[in-house]
Every structure is written in structure tokens, then in C-alpha cells.
Amino acid sequence: MATKKKVNVTINGVQVQVPEDYTVLLAAREAGIDIPTLCYLKDINEVAACRLCVCEAEVNGKPMRNLPTSCVLKVEDGMVVRTDTERVRKAVKMNLELILANHNRECLTCTRNQTCELQKLCHEMGIDMEWFDGETRSVCYDDLSPAIVRDSTKCVLCGRCVSACAKLQNISVLEFVNRGVNTKVAPGFGYSIKDTDCIYCGQCINVCPVAAIKEKSHIKQVWDAIQDPKKHVVVQTAPAVRAALGEEFGVTMGKAVTGKMVSALKRLGFDKVFDTNFSADLTIMEEGYEFINRVKNKGTLPMITSCSPGWIRYCEVFYPEFIPNLSTCKSPQQMFGAVAKSYYAKKEGINPKNIVCVSVMPCTAKKAECARPEMQVDGHRDVDYVLTTRELAKMINEARIMFDKLPEADPDPIMGEYTGAGVIFGATGGVMEAALRTVADVLTGKDLKDVDYEAVRGIDFFKQASVTLPIGGKDVEVKVGVVSSIAAAEKVLNAIAAGELQLHFLEVMACPGGCVHGGGQPHVSAKNRLDK
């Protein structure tokens, strides 16, 4: 790969050498200079909408007209940039104050209090008064969908959600509607989110800098169930939750806090605390046997995983011809709920109608999944309520539990035991690897060696591999693929339909990188997202 040409740029008196395709914003960060942004997301939303990243710039000794935005201004050799002048500071503060003039300022009770990027910028820029007042945009509060809530009074028109939905997922549920003071971000034609093709993945929530889009909270319902003496409340936690929950309490990003999480759940009042890995193992076993049966009996191939509810909804809406390819397995969340209200209820002598099953998931689409009409038996919902990782953190804080002081605890027995296979479900490729290991063990009685995946040129977030397994009395080269993000999945499905890609088994995760980047995980600022 050819080395990119470097250019010399001076920013606030600091000389830095960067690739010629860099923007001034990226060059400034290389030089250790933080330029404020609200709308910017690298490679996703580079539209200069907020105008908080303005600067003064000179090229060949000639000042550029007006104040260009550094997020889209390309560097040039010898360019001189200033972001610390009085003119720039005044412009940034005024633009920030204009954004605030059209913003709902209920910061103390807002769900994004202390994680709001707008709030942080106001603090950093010393905004302590409201200088502008006037006509504001019309109010739209949409809480009709089972998973996502929109609040237009908090929208800053940054466009991040529009770009994420279009570029990461290629669905484009959200768009800019109307003009001038009436401009808003919303589904077209005045539709509610629930009346669109939204898959409830929550990537729009992940990128929103404020609280204009958030998950539909189940916190009150869960508290009510815990306080009801007639209800036996059980909770399951997904693998990706333990790796992210600690971030809400100052723990290093990515560090697992399994023991403290279990301890916190018990203190919250849940009667039993279980691990979704238990049902993940069940899913792996069922999926593995189903795959063997399909290959032996010339069933529909490639078999495609059914763990990701966002992916399932996408398939149903956009690619119904692939529905026969989907595994017949319920997701681990729903499988756990079904087992909890049958096997567990019988084992413990509890009437299923008195069991409330709560899930803690990294995923907003799980809220929509548990509400699907078919996810019940004899009138009993498999899963009653779903909490995101963020919601669990709020409950822990509300209960005044000091997370860092908690002792380590283990999940309850009966459905608290599991193998290591389910643990890797949270990362892309985890479901596939676990299922293949099960298939290999069933067919050969031996452990499968590491699966060596190779990236596929032209499709981001997609990799494939091949494994030789004895199926139906002969060695079969099983071709498998792993894809995350709906935009990438669409390319893979099109390649399969066109006969350009032959696979036996395909894992699809709706969120880029898998469940660890789900729509219910702790908020990460755009700057930290870039750094990580």
C-alpha cells in the first residue's frame, strides 16, 4: 500500500506533519489541540452543521474568507490555522448559544445529564446565560414504538442519527423534514417510528449527542414487579453487559464486572439472578444440530443465525425471500424466558403467571423482540421487560448502591451454570464459532481448532472461513461467514442471491462489531469514539 504524502501544517503555533487527506480537525487532534464539535462523526457525519469547529486559516499567506469549519477543511502544505483567537472564541460561543436557544434545557432531569455532549461544551466554553430567545421549533414527542422514543425539543439538528441510519444500516428511517425554523429530524410524511421500517437497533441513540433519541424505559415496570410480593422476579444478563456496565461507574472501558453486577442485581431485589449464557448454550446446541440436519438432508442453505432481533426484523421487511434460511431457534433471551416459565417454574413449584422475567441487554431491539405477539406460551410472555445496560446503571444509582464497594457474587444455580461458548456471543463471530465447535464435538468428539477468518475485500464488517467436517459419511468443506451492520449484511445477501458468494452458514449481527456496540450500551462521546 502506497504511503500517503505528508504536508506541514501549523495550528496555534504548533507544527505538525499529517497525511494530505486529513482535515484541519484531525490535524489539530494530532497536535494535541481539541477543537469543539457537536455534529462530527468521522466517516459517518462530516457535514459542518453545528459550526462549532470554526477556525481562522491562511494558505500561502492569504487569509481564507470568513471562518471555515475545520471538520471539512482539508489541510494544505504550509497552511497556518488559529483556533484560539478572540474572533473564533466569540463565534463558537455565539453558535453554541444559538443552539441552546432552541433546546429544551431541563438538564437536571434529563436522561443524558452528565453524559450530554452539548452540556459538556457549554461548561467548557463558559456559557452561563441565555442570550437568545424567540420562536422555537414545534414539539414532537414520539413514544409509540416498543423500543425507541424521540423528543424533538432536545434535537440540535446535528444529523448524526440521519447519517448513522443511512450509512451504518442503509435503512434511512430518519431524515431532515421542512425548512428554516420548522426544520426537524423525523421519519417522512409525519410517521411515528413504529410505522416505519425501523429495526430498533438503536445506533441512532448511540450517536445522538443529546437526549433527542433514547430507549423506551422499562425501569418503572421492573421496580413495580420487584415491589410486588406476589411476583417472583428473575433476571438474566447478556455477556456484553458485564463488559460495559462498569463504564457507568468509572471502571476502565471493556473491563468485565460480572461479580459486582450480580451482587448489585441481588441488592436491587431480584429473587433470582441468572446468566443468559445458560440459554446461549441451549441456542448453540439447537443451532448446531439444526445445521447438521440441513446439510445432511439438503435443507435450505446457507443457514443464517436468528439471535439478533434487529437483523430478524430487517430480513422480514427487506429480504423475506431469506426467511427460510433463518435458524428456527429463538434468541438466547427468548429461549431463557421460555425455559424460566416452564422448566424453572416446575422445578421451583411456582405458577408461571407469578414469574416476571427481566432481561438486561446491550440491545434496544430486544425490547421490541420481547413484545412480538408470538413470543408467549399459554398467555405468558417469554420475557416481560428488557433493561438496557444504561437502564440497569440508573437503577443501581437510584438504589444508592456503591458499585465499587460491592462484593463479588455468582449467578444462582439451576440456570446459572454455563460453558465458555456463550461468553463470546457478544462479539461478532462469537455465535458462529460456538456453533461450529458444537458441530465438531457432535460429529468427531474432538475440539475444533481455532477458526481462521479472512476479511473480504469490498465489504466492511464481513469475514469468512472454511472448516472441514465429517457430515453424512463424507468430509464436507463447510464455508461460513460472519457479518455485522445491516449495510454490510445487505451486500452479503445480494452476493448470495446473485450466486457470487457460496456459504453453508452465516452469522448476522445488526450492530457494527456485534452486541458490544449495541444501542443500549453506555454513551460514548464522539471524541472518545474516535480515540477508541
Where do the PLM segments sit?
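Unusually extended, aromatic-enriched hydrophobic runs near protein termini
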Residues: D151-K154, G159-V162, S172, G180-A212, ...
